[in-house]
């Protein structure tokens, strides 16, 4: 029985990245659909759940992707609600790669040092990766703050994270180097989740900070989000601080993404969202 992966993408075009990883994760065929919404996904789900029976059903799976996490979450919920009884297939959510990227980064930090009770700051924490990273850090028992261009926007995103993960998150302004330096002054952990090619933290803000123990940056394109570290860093020490660059994190992210795809075909009842993906990341880190 061929392993079929259906990519339900909320963007105008299905993701090439997710298609490639789908094949590398073990799918025999990946079929992508664009502009998928909760309103039009019903017939697509029907095609996955009514065509195969018994153990053959586990050879069909759904991946929800696209660049917008809010749209992805709404679509993911609609897909799950369309299942009933034995009429279901395994499904995974990874809009914008946020679940796998954030999970890989935080899992590596958690392996390096205990995070419970530590002060963690997620720079540019209102994006999909930043919000998921904040959630995972909070799950580990860290005291989490996220930054954004305005404190108001950061606090709004913090409320969303709190509701989703049942943790406490604070918001802080981080529009300038000075504001971001102030935000990380007392931090033990810094997770930089900004846009590609945008430096968020100059070396002067962290190099001699005695509080900072761990640094993570998911920006692989120069200038990096954290000045002074390398994209390939995976636990490299800088002045007593352990750093993880985007490529150092990315190796685990890709392995994790592929492993999640493989697990979709192990049963017809798998549901892989933030918590499930993070648990797997910790096993693999």
Predicted regions span which residues?
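Glycine/charged-rich beta-loop-alpha catalytic/anionic-binding loops adjacent to active sites
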Residues: 84-92, 238-240
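Conserved active-site and cofactor/substrate-binding residues in soluble primary-metabolism enzymes
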Residues: 35-39, 70-74, 100, 104, ...
